[in-house]
């Protein structure tokens, strides 16, 4: 195992870790870099400090490896750490093969899957969150890493790390952590101590940065998705802060409604994890855990912390109480809502939190307890987690064979041809496989030409395709019978073909042998032998048409193969007219301006003049 030395006890960590007698030698504490303990009053560690600490850990312990995941919007490097035993980390390539094989179950039977599950280890993603003003998340991850690495010889910790590889992200919004920490520390002790950051902590999107799971517009979202598809965790846990007052932490089960395409066994795992975390909190004497309620539902698949459910991963978030930043606050009973001032235990709120002080360190400790409970759960049930990943994917494949829609057909000829490409590229980047017809083919009684795209639903991530391509039917939930409807927590509908103006046909009859013979898979099947790489940063746009900037979706072969039909110039004349209804036209207009063209507008079209014939053809291609 890792080095060890008898040392003084620090903060006692939670769940299965008992009162300890030793710390492993050479494992530095966060204070050695931060100058203060994580969660200290009036103190926030920046992202740069956090990464400096994780690098120090990686240099000191054989139980941690640090990986680059990609670059942020502002150019910072995103990192995640793998924490486990040295023996497990030495076999990480083999375990990654197992995770990939179970995630993509084609040709794998139950017997072989059970053998792989028994051989493998659970892979658990935990991160410090992405809402940067919810400051406890990225303060708890360094402490979690330290408490695991410095106690690796303790039986409880060893039992966890023997069976789990922890994928720990210090934060998934590095830019935001840096901005918010610097802003708060600049204002501590002034009248502006609690003032809000006067700019978006995630460029362009702000607080909605966790609503990018299927559109993948943010470079950070693509870096995370790219990493997930290379490693395929069985659990994804994202920390948030804003639990319903006066509770101290909200945990799954979710409130109603939940996603109709969520695989049942995965939904059950999420519920079990929520209860395991609550149990761990009560065992530690940390009251105030609650579940369900009317706030946090799981209807919307845009959450980066819930969308993985539709790829057969137990994904969820929690909401830990927050006052403001690292400033402590003392609550009185008069601040509590009148209906909970009696502190009466409830079915899903069995240990009411009494009023008193609430500090950043309290939130950090609650988060660490919940994280450790998640790791402990994964260690105890690792065979089940691995096997259920296989079973859920297998069942999705079977569902696509026996229940419509059996596929989605996307013609190349569209009102905006590039919009169809953009929709499909996002699905493919997220692991949904897309095929293309090689010739004229009849499907569901209609003949489709070569080049038509097909998304079959007999594939393991088909639930994600159905979630975003079908029309949502929000349930009729009332506050009481005959009363007003309950307000949706977030989006009630998001049908991408309607939002993006793309013609998508749901196929109601099974794909024939002839139809399948005419389909060519775009990109290879996942290959676990391919070594993981960071999401590529590029200043040049990979796609010559209107798409996300930089490397975009081209780092995934299946997505890169989805391209619009070549454009062409028809007719003759001095003015090139482009359709104002097509997004790609505006890219062409900007390129034309750079060529020195004049731009006019008439009858719903833009006219680009003073261009040579060669320049016109270049813009249309």
Descriptions of predicted regions:
Residues 228-242:
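Proline-aspartate-enriched helix->loop->beta-strand connector
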Residues 21-165, 205, 211, 217-219, ...:
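Intrinsic-disorder/low-complexity accessory segments
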Residues 145-149, 163-185:
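Carboxylate/His-rich catalytic cores and anion/metal-binding grooves
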Residues 6-16:
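Bacterial N-terminal signal peptides
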Residues 130-132, 170-176, 213-215, 243:
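Acidic, glycine-rich active-site loops and adjacent beta-strand->loop/helix elements
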């Amino acid at each position: 195992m890792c080095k060890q030395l008898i040392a003084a006890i620090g903060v006692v960590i939670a769940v299965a870790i008992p009162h300890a007698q030793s710390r492993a030698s050479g494992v530095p504490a966060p204070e050695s870099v931060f100058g203060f303990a994580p969660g200290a009053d009036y103190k926030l560690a920046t992202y740069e400090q956090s990464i400096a600490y994780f690098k120090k850990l990686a240099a000191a312990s054989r139980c941690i490896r640090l990986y680059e995941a990609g670059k942020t919007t502002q150019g910072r490097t995103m990192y995640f750490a793998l924490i486990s035993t040295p023996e497990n980390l030495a076999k990480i390539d083999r375990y990654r093969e197992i995770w990939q094989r179970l995630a993509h179950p084609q040709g794998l039977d139950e017997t072989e899957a059970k053998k792989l599950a028994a051989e493998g280890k659970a892979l658990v993603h935990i991160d410090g969150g992405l809402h940067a003003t919810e400051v406890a998340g990225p303060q708890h991850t360094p402490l979690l890493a330290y408490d695991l690495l410095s106690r690796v010889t303790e039986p409880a910790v060893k039992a966890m790390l023997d069976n789990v590889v922890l994928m720990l992200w210090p934060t998934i919004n590095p830019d935001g952590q840096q901005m918010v920490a610097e802003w708060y520390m600049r204002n501590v002790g002034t009248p502006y101590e609690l003032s809000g950051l006067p700019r978006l902590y995630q460029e362009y999107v702000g607080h909605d940065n966790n609503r990018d799971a299927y559109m993948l517009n943010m470079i950070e979202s693509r870096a995370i998705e790219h990493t997930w598809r290379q490693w395929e965790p069985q659990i994804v846990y994202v920390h948030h802060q804003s639990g319903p007052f006066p509770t101290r932490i909200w945990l799954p089960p979710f409130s109603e409604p939940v996603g109709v395409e969520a695989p049942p066994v995965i939904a059950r795992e999420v519920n079990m994890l929520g209860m395991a975390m609550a149990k761990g909190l009560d065992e530690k004497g940390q009251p105030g855990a609650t579940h369900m309620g009317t706030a946090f539902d799981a209807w919307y698949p845009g959450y980066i912390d819930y969308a993985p459910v539709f790829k057969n991963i137990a994904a969820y978030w929690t909401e830990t109480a927050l006052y403001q930043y690292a400033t402590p606050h003392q609550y009185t009973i008069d601040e509590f809502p009148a209906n909970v001032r009696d502190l009466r235990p409830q079915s899903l709120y069995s240990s009411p939190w009494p009023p008193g002080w609430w500090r950043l360190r309290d939130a950090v400790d609650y988060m660490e307890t919940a994280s450790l409970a998640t790791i402990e759960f994964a260690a105890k049930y690792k065979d089940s987690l691995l096997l259920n990943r296989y079973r859920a994917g297998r069942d999705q494949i079977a569902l696509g064979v026996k229940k419509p829609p059996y596929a989605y057909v996307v013609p190349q000829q569209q009102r905006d041809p590039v919009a169809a490409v953009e929709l499909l590229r996002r699905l493919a980047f997220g692991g949904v496989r897309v095929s293309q017809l090689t010739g004229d083919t009849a499907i569901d009684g209609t003949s489709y030409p070569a080049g038509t795209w097909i998304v079959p639903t007999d594939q393991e991530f088909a639930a994600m395709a159905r979630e975003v391509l079908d029309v949502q039917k929000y349930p009729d939930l009332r506050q009481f019978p005959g009363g007003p409807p309950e307000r949706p927590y977030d989006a009630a509908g998001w049908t991408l073909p309607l939002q993006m103006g793309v013609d998508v046909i749901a196929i109601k009859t099974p794909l024939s042998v002839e139809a399948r013979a005419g389909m060519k898979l775009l990109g290879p099947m996942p290959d676990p032998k391919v070594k993981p790489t960071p999401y590529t940063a590029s200043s040049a746009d990979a796609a010559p048409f209107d798409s996300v900037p930089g490397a975009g979706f081209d780092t995934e072969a299946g997505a890169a193969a989805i391209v619009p039909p070549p454009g062409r110039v028809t007719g003759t004349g001095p003015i090139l007219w482009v359709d104002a209804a097509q997004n790609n036209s505006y890219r062409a207009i900007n390129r034309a301006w750079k060529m020195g063209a004049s731009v006019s507008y008439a009858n719903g079209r833009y006219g680009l003049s003073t261009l040579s014939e060669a320049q016109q053809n270049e813009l249309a291609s």
